[in-house]
Amino acid sequence: MPDPARAKRLAKRISTIVASAIEYEIKDPRLAGVTITDAKVTNDLHDATLYYTVLGRSLDEEPDYEGAAAGLEKAKGVLRTKVGASLGVRFTPTLAFARDTVPDAAHRMEALLAQARAADEDLARVREGAKHAGDSDPYRVLGEGDLEGPATGGPDVEDEGGANSHDR
């Protein structure tokens, strides 16, 4: 019977074993900036997918994703052997590596948010000295001689008679 809790524990353990082996035991220079971010194990415990990110050598340099993928593919057998020796389970899961795109998407979202903030600041600067176009109440009609008197001729003026008047 599949046990999801056991699969999660096994995935966490596999993640630490593989990350440690990549950092300390595998001497492939293509794996220098590889970090294991997550691991998923199927409920039957036969397959494990490890998600990784690759860091560039400097902030300006683009990471070598193809080289890291080739290095992980080459080291897959050695890593599976180390996982099997450390876990002590009857069947050692097969390892598959997938590039984790979450950090890239997060950087893209941060850039979009920064761009939106800059646009908001530009709009706020433009808005500072602006005033409304026209009068405060464009539908208000002032009476003769009244500067601030009641409106005349508008819909709020009492009707002296006509279709809307009631009998008194």
UniProtKB/Swiss-Prot annotation:
TM helices/strands, residue ranges: none
Note the superkingdom of the native organism. Answer: Bacteria
Positions with biased composition (Basic and acidic residues): 125-138
Concerning PROSITE patterns, the annotation shows:
RBFA (PS01319)
GO terms, biological process: maturation of SSU-rRNA
MF GO annotations: ribosomal small subunit binding
Q: What is its main location?
A: cytoplasm
Q: Which InterPro entries does this one have? A: KH_dom-like_a/b (IPR015946), RbfA (IPR000238), RbfA_dom_sf (IPR023799), Ribosome-bd_factorA_CS (IPR020053)
The UniProt annotation puts the region (Disordered) at 125-168
Keyword set includes Cytoplasm: yes
Cell compartments where the protein resides? Cytoplasm
Which keywords, in A-to-Z order, does the entry hold? Cytoplasm, Ribosome biogenesis
Q: Which cellular component appears as one GO term in the record? A: cytosol
Q: Does the keyword DNA damage apply?
A: no
Describe the protein's quaternary organization and the partners it interacts with: Monomer. Binds 30S ribosomal subunits, but not 50S ribosomal subunits or 70S ribosomes.
What is this protein for, i.e. what is its function?
A: One of several proteins that assist in the late maturation steps of the functional core of the 30S ribosomal subunit. Associates with free 30S ribosomal subunits (but not with 30S subunits that are part of 70S ribosomes or polysomes). Required for efficient processing of 16S rRNA. May interact with the 5'-terminal helix region of 16S rRNA.
Which family would the database say this protein is a member of?
Belongs to the RbfA family.
**Name the record gives this protein:** Ribosome-binding factor A
